[in-house]
């Protein structure tokens, strides 16, 4: 019997026009299509003549096992997921099931991961450009992750001034997690920090709410919602949520380079310039603790500069 194949397909936010050509081709080639029932509905028009296996919530490992069994019998399987199947999706669990069953890459069943536009990208596109600078995503689902781990990640992201995308913010049974997330974020962020609450991006019941961090938990939020929380520079203007890339740190609005900066070179407070600045402050009698407070950094970062030999450039 010939070996089968498993396509792990991310088909994007749901609208057909946002599905990649490769995702369509993989579904078309498949003998069997497996997915959460809601995902099956979103691609129903592509499934004529195929064996379709619908699964419910909490049956993720069953989907992986079924995909493996069908592929073992020589069939081509498309295990589908909305968004990107490698981002909070089925790619990881599938590989775990395969490896636990003795499968190894290059032997037997072929596996191909097909990426798709994930929820944070889709939601960001609908509200402007909130992800133009450093960002992170955190799932508030504690079904598989202990809350202390989630809280620690929220704390770190808030302190580091990341734009934060919250996945799985709330469900019928999980209503307190978004409130706790808001509390943690408010320890480091202004109550006026812009927030976008996007439900069912690019689907029939799409809704968008622009609000502030202080009101975030009061918004209509559910399992199909992604929440985007700005950093200290994010702003909303004319209905657009925008996070500056940082050009204002180096350039005037005229396009001219600011005094002390050079086009195409690190900022004056880039890594080298920052270390020079730290050494200057130390030579002026400032203590490591004072310098750490000035830059809002752990004192160990200042001590690391003190322990280095100055670079000669």
Q: What is each of the regions a protein language model found here?
A:
Residues 1-111, 217, 256-268, 272, ...:
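Class I S-adenosyl-L-methionine
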Residues 6, 159-269:
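A contiguous loop/helix-start segment that scaffolds small-molecule binding in enzyme catalytic cores
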Residues 10, 79-82, 114, 138-141, ...:
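Short beta-strand segments
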Residues 15, 83-88, 117-119, 171-174, ...:
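Gly/Ser/Thr-rich loops at beta-strand to alpha-helix junctions
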Residues 15, 21, 90-163:
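Class I SAM-dependent methyltransferase SAM-binding "motif I" and its flanking Rossmann-like core
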Residues 270-286, 300:
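Short, amphipathic alpha-helical "recognition" segments used to contact nucleic acids or chromatin
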Residues 290-293:
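Short alpha-helical "recognition helix" segments of helix-turn-helix
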Residues 295, 306:
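DNA major-groove recognition helix of helix-turn-helix
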């Amino acid at each position: 019997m010939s070996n089968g194949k498993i396509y792990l397909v991310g088909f994007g936010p749901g609208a057909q026009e946002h599905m990649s050509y490769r995702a369509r081709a993989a579904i078309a080639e498949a003998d069997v299509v497996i997915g959460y029932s809601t995902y099956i509905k979103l691609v129903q028009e592509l499934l004529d003549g195929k064996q379709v296996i619908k699964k419910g919530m909490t049956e993720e490992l069953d989907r992986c096992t079924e995909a493996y069994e069908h592929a073992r019998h020589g069939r081509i399987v498309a295990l589908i997921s909305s968004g990107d199947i490698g981002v909070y999706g089925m790619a990881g669990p599938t590989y775990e099931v395969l490896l636990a069953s003795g499968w190894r890459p290059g032997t037997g069943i072929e596996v191909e991961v097909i990426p798709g536009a994930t929820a944070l990208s889709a939601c960001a596109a609908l509200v402007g450009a909130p992800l133009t600078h450093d960002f992170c995503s955190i799932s508030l689902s504690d079904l598989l992750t202990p809350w202390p781990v989630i809280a620690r990640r929220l704390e770190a992201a808030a302190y580091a001034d990341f734009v934060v995308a919250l996945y799985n913010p709330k469900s019928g049974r999980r209503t307190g997690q978004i409130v706790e997330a808001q509390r943690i974020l408010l320890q480091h962020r202004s109550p006026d920090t812009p927030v976008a609450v996007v439900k069912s991006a690019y689907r029939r019941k799409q809704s968008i709410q622009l609000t502030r961090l202080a009101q975030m938990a009061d918004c209509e939020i559910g399992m199909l919602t992604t929440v985007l929380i700005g950093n200290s520079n994010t702003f909303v203007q004319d209905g657009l949520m925008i996070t500056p890339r940082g050009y204002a740190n180096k350039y005037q609005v005229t396009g001219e380079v600011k005094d002390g900066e050079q086009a195409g070179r690190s900022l004056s407070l880039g890594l080298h310039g920052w270390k020079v600045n730290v050494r200057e402050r130390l030579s002026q009698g400032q203590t490591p603790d004072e310098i750490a407070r000035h830059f809002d950094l752990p004192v160990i970062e200042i001590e690391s500069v003190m322990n280095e030999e100055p670079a000669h450039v």
